[in-house]
């Protein structure tokens, strides 16, 4: 029995499912999850001593690679001054200034502790600001585990939402309308049915929780236009895409202006941080200046702020995103060539430092239904074959992959060579 197997057996007796976040349990691919001892650069090292080229990157934050020296040093120095004060610090101000400078649509920003907190708070703020209750989300998009967001689509885009997790009252979910990603007609129909009831649209500008599905050219501008027409706010969830697709996020890459933006992952440099911000008049409705309540004991804590400030300072350096895109393109092209050589039907979606692999005969993958039509069983086999080769992909056919600037061209070539051998076995 490997040490990972032993630890997993022990963990299942102490932690529900043996993990503290479900996807880590390898439920989507089968088998025993890796228990990690350390990480450095583009590599993970498990408790059994095996190294892996890592394309999960802690689910997105590690855009600079693991254990980056500038972030590590910033955390060490912050720890020496104290872990948490429950009072304002200078670093919170510096961090807010940096974020609002990097993301011009954010006039003001409020720090929280996770992406879920960011989206939950932004939706509450949108409801409070507009005086409306209903929200629109999209099938296949994930915005954290707040009750109003754990909703699946019904028989049509306008079906009142039903919860897809026990413990979420139907009365909560009924205010969530689920539309089809990349389908403006479904959104337009929702607004026409509830013209004065919808507070906001919340959307992933690149859907990264049904693998990686970029928006069609007309989709995000169309959402902006519909929000303007019907008096709703547009919330862009950049928890995954922020500072990764482009320095100012996917909103800059796709040239769309949101009312509110949610951030996470990279903003913490590996520490638990989230943030939301946007128009000054909307943010002024937030307590203590306004009536919409939001709070957090550890929000803006000095360790997380130090890590995030160091990370964003590095990410803002000239050339980072060009390198990230070049490496991702190199990987995508190499995987497509390797799959073609072995007659394996494969679509690779990618933008900036995000990518997704789809085993499908379809020419494109642009929505949730396209994703669901892909060959999940083939992905499972591919995942485990790649794991044996020392390449760690996301352990789910419905999660995006992430590149870092710590990955070398040699790492990419090793990955492509491994994939070619694995494709030959499929």
From Swiss-Prot:
Top-level division of the source organism's lineage: Bacteria
One GO cellular-component annotation of the UniProt record comes to: cytoplasm
Q: What EC number(s) does its UniProt record assign?
A: 5.4.3.8
Subcellular location(s) per record:
Cytoplasm
What is one process in the GO biological process aspect for this record?
Answer: protoporphyrinogen IX biosynthetic process
Keyword check for Isomerase, yes or no: yes
Q: Isomerase as a keyword?
A: yes
Q: Name one Pfam family in it.
A: Aminotran_3
Keywords, comma-separated and alphabetical: Cytoplasm, Isomerase, Porphyrin biosynthesis, Pyridoxal phosphate
InterPro entries named among the record's database cross-references: 4pyrrol_synth_GluAld_NH2Trfase, Aminotrans_3, Aminotrans_3_PPA_site, PyrdxlP-dep_Trfase, PyrdxlP-dep_Trfase_major, PyrdxlP-dep_Trfase_small
Q: Which pathway or pathways does this protein act in?
A: Porphyrin-containing compound metabolism; protoporphyrin-IX biosynthesis; 5-aminolevulinate from L-glutamyl-tRNA(Glu): step 2/2
Catalyses: (S)-4-amino-5-oxopentanoate = 5-aminolevulinate
Q: Which cofactor does it need?
A: pyridoxal 5'-phosphate
GO molecular function term, any single one? transaminase activity
Residues annotated with N6-(pyridoxal phosphate)lysine modification = 265
> How does this chain assemble?
Homodimer.
The text of the family note is: Belongs to the class-III pyridoxal-phosphate-dependent aminotransferase family. HemL subfamily.
What is this protein's record name? Glutamate-1-semialdehyde 2,1-aminomutase
Q: What is the lineage of its organism?
A: Bacteria, Pseudomonadati, Pseudomonadota, Gammaproteobacteria, Enterobacterales
């Amino acid at each position: 029995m490997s040490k990972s197997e032993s630890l997993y057996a022990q963990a299942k007796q102490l932690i529900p499912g043996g993990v503290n976040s479900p996807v880590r349990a390898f439920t989507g691919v089968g088998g025993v999850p890796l228990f990690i001892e350390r990480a450095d650069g583009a590599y993970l090292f498990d408790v059994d001593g095996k190294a892996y080229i890592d394309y999960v990157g802690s689910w997105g934050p590690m855009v600079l690679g693991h254990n980056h020296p500038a972030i590590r040093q910033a955390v060490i120095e912050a720890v020496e001054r104290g872990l948490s004060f429950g009072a304002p610090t200078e670093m919170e101000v510096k961090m807010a200034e940096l974020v609002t400078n990097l993301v011009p649509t954010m006039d003001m920003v409020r720090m929280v502790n996770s992406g879920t907190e960011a989206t939950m708070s932004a939706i509450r703020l949108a409801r409070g600001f507009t005086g409306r209750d209903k929200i629109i989300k999209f099938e296949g998009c994930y915005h954290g585990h707040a009750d109003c967001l754990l909703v699946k689509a019904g028989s049509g885009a306008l079906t009142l939402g039903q919860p897809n997790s026990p413990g979420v009252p139907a009365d909560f979910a009924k205010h969530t309308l689920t539309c089809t990603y990349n389908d403006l007609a479904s959104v337009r129909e929702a607004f026409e049915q509830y013209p004065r009831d919808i507070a906001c649209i919340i959307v992933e500008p690149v859907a990264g929780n049904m693998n990686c599905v970029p928006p069609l050219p007309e989709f995000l501008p169309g959402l902006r236009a519909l929000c303007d027409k019907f008096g709703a706010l547009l919330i862009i969830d950049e928890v995954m895409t922020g500072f990764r697709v482009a320095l100012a996020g996917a909103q800059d890459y796709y040239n769309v202006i949101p009312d509110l933006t949610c951030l996470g992952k990279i903003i913490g440099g590996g520490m638990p941080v989230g943030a939301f911000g946007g128009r000054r008049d909307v943010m002024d409705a937030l307590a203590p200046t306004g009536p919409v309540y939001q709070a957090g004991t550890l929000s803006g804590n000095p360790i997380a702020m130090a890590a995030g400030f160091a990370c964003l300072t590095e990410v803002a350096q000239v050339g980072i995103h060009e390198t990230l895109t070049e490496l991702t393109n190199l990987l995508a092209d190499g995987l497509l060539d390797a799959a073609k050589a072995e007659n394996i039907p494969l679509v690779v979606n990618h933008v900036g430092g995000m990518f997704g692999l789809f085993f499908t005969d379809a020419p494109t993958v642009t929505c949730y239904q396209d994703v669901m039509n892909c060959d999940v069983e083939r992905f499972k086999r591919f995942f485990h074959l790649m794991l044996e080769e020392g390449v760690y992909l996301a352990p789910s056919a419905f999660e995006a992959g992430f590149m870092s600037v710590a990955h070398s061209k040699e790492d990419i070539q090793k990955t492509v060579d491994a994939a070619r051998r694995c494709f030959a076995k499929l």
